[in-house]
C-alpha cells in the first residue's frame, strides 16, 4: 500500500514568517543596576577639577560664655582653620568606543547602532563610577572611614543591635544604610528571628527595608570576601556637612553632569572612534558623616520548629 502523503491546503507558519517583521529589542545588559548611591548623593560642581575641603582646627577651643547678669569679663576667642586642607582631585572613568562605519551605515534600522553602542558603554562606565565611589583607595567611602567610626558586629550576623550601634556613630541626621543585598537579607533573617520584621518604605518607585526609619539601600559594589561584608551609614548633603559627590561642569561634549562623549574621527580602516569620559570624586565633609559596620557575616541561617502539626 502506498504511503499517504499530506498535501498542504493552506500557507504554513514557517513560510508565512518569512514575510513577517519581528519586533526586536535593544540589547539587554545584565550588569546594569539601579545605582541608588549615585541618586542619593548631592553632587557639587567643582572648578578646575579640584575640591579643597577646609576644616576648623581644634573646634573645642572656641570659647563662649553664658552671661550671669554681672560684669564678669567675657571670653575672647577666634576660630582657626587647618593650614593644609585636603584637596580632592576628580577621577576619570574613561574608554574609547570603536564602531565600524559599515556596521553603522547598513545595520541601523530599527535601532541605531552607534546610539546603542554608546548607551551600553555609558551604562558600564556608570557602573564603574559607583564601584569607585565605594571602593576607590583614595576617595572611596570604605577608604575614608575614620577609626573612631568603625565598629564590629556583636555575633557575626548583622543584628538590630549592630545597626543601633551604627546609628550612634552617625546620629546627626543619618541618611541611609548602604549594604550588599546579601547583607540586607542577613539582617532581615536576624530581625525575623527576633520577631521584629523591619518596615518598608517606597523610594524611587521601589520598596526598601528600613531600620529606625532609615532605609537600607542595596548595592552589589560593596565587597564580599570570605562570606563577610560591610554595612555603611551615611549622612549626605553639603548643608548637613555630610558626604557629597563631585563632578566637573561644562565639559566639551557633555551629555550629563560630568559625562562627556566626543567624536575622535575615522581612521584608515573606516572605524569611527568616540572618547567617553566620566569625571567624578567623593568627599566626606566631616568624620561623623560616615560609619561602617565591619565583619558582617552573610551565611547565617536559623531553623524554626514546625508548629503547625
Regions found by a protein language model. Give the residues of each.
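Intrinsically disordered, low-complexity linker/loop segments enriched in Gly/Pro
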Residues: 75-81, 86-101
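Short charge-dense sequence patches
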Residues: 63-79, 111-118, 140, 194, ...
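Alpha-helical scaffold segments that mediate packing/assembly in large oligomeric complexes
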Residues: 94, 98-173
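Helix N-cap / beta->alpha transition motif
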Residues: 102, 178-183, 235, 286
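Sequence/fold signature of self-assembling virion shell proteins
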Residues: 199-309
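N-terminal "assembly arms/tails" that initiate or stabilize quaternary assembly
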Residues: 2-84, 286-288
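Extended, solvent-exposed, turn-rich assembly/linker loops in the middle of proteins
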Residues: 145-208
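Structural beta-strand/beta-sheet cores of well-ordered domains, especially the beta-sheet scaffolds
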Residues: 95, 173-175, 212, 272
Amino acid at each position: 500500500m502506498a504511503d499517504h502523503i499530506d498535501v498542504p491546503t493552506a500557507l504554513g507558519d514557517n513560510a508565512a514568517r518569512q514575510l513577517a517583521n519581528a519586533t526586536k529589542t535593544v540589547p539587554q545588559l545584565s550588569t546594569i543596576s539601579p545605582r541608588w548611591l549615585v541618586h542619593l548623593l548631592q553632587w557639587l560642581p567643582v572648578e578646575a577639577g579640584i575640591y579643597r575641603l577646609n576644616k576648623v582646627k581644634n573646634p573645642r577651643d572656641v570659647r563662649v560664655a553664658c552671661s550671669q547678669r554681672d560684669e564678669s569679663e567675657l571670653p575672647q576667642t577666634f576660630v582657626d582653620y587647618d593650614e593644609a586642607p585636603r584637596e580632592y582631585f576628580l577621577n576619570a572613568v574613561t574608554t574609547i568606543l570603536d564602531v565600524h562605519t559599515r556596521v553603522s551605515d547598513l545595520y541601523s534600522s530599527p535601532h541605531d547602532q552607534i546610539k546603542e553602542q554608546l548607551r551600553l558603554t555609558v551604562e558600564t562606565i556608570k557602573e564603574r563610577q559607583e564601584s569607585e565611589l565605594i571602593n576607590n583607595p583614595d576617595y572611596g567611602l570604605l577608604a575614608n572611614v575614620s577609626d573612631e567610626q568603625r565598629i564590629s558586629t556583636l555575633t557575626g550576623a548583622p543584628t538590630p543591635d549592630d545597626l543601633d550601634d551604627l546609628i550612634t556613630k552617625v546620629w546627626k541626621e543619618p541618611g541611609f544604610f548602604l549594604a550588599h543585598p546579601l547583607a540586607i537579607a542577613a539582617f532581615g533573617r536576624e530581625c525575623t528571628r527576633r520577631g521584629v520584621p523591619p518596615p518598608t518604605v517606597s523610594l524611587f518607585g521601589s520598596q526598601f527595608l528600613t531600620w529606625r526609619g532609615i532605609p537600607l539601600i542595596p548595592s552589589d559594589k560593596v565587597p564580599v570576601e570570605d562570606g563577610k561584608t560591610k554595612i555603611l551609614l551615611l549622612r549626605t548633603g553639603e548643608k548637613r556637612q555630610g558626604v557629597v559627590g563631585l563632578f566637573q561642569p561644562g565639559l566639551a561634549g557633555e551629555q550629563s553632569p560630568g559625562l562627556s562623549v566626543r567624536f575622535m574621527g575615522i581612521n584608515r580602516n573606516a572605524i569611527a572612534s568616540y572618547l567617553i569620559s566620566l569625571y567624578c570624586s567623593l568627599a566626606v565633609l566631616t568624620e561623623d558623616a560616615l560609619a561602617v559596620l565591619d565583619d558582617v557575616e552573610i551565611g547565617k541561617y536559623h531553623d524554626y520548629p514546625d508548629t503547625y502539626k
